[in-house]
Amino acid sequence: MLEAVHRGARRIEGNPIDTVSGRFAHGAQALALELAERLPAGALRLRDPVMRVLVDDGVVAVEAASGVTTARHVVVAIPPALAVEAINFSPDLPADMRSLAEGTAVWMGGVVKAVAVFDKAYWRDVGLAGAAVSYQGPFSEVHDHSGPGGSPAALFGFAAAAPFDGATPEQIGAAFADQLYRLFGAAAATPRHVHVTDWSAERYTSPRAPSPRAATTGYGHPLYQRPTAGRIHWASTETSAQHPGHIEGALWAGTRAARAILVATEAA
């Protein structure tokens, strides 16, 4: 579906936004949960935010709420802008590194996402892909978010968070349902439930005070490809030179950081 300004929604052939790809049957968190189960007991600490990273004489000390952990290397896997806002680095990061991090926008950091759940994926029965691009909004894209075989049935969309500033999840959900009605007909107007997340308000996703100059131009910057002070490795998806902003980018950045640490360890 394509929704143009002042022209309403119209059906177009094919799928305008979704290409051939793979999806996690039980959500992307399934990968993280599976990997977490393979870690040694006590290796993973939840609800334990890092407050300070100190590099001194070849040793990295990471200070968190639970105490201090030392290592030879540290991997920063959160968005750089969030890292430099929330973590005190000592010695301070080089000026060019800090400036780059502050100016690197968090992918989807200023976005509201909504998932409308239905009893069945009725749009498939009438030959619709469940995908839409809208220039009228407030949601700019809609995707079929259903599980294997269409169950559970769901449509997902995202919109800029700024227009919803101060809105409740219920109000955002209602706006999404109204737009789905315009796009996919009356059956879309009454979802069983709408899940809403404002990523701009998530403490560990978006900085509390994003830089007004934040942009995606810093994605995959050369400074992210090598460790700062030889010990601090940047591995969020924004730092990836390949597919930045996507899961593939996060995997690529994590692999790059791991390889760099292995090389440094073997050479020590």
Which residues does each predicted region cover?
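Aromatic-acidic/polar surface patches that form glycan- and anion
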Residues: I17-A28, A43-L46, G67-V68, A105-G109, ...
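A generic "structured core" feature
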Residues: L44, V50, V60-V62, A71-V76, ...
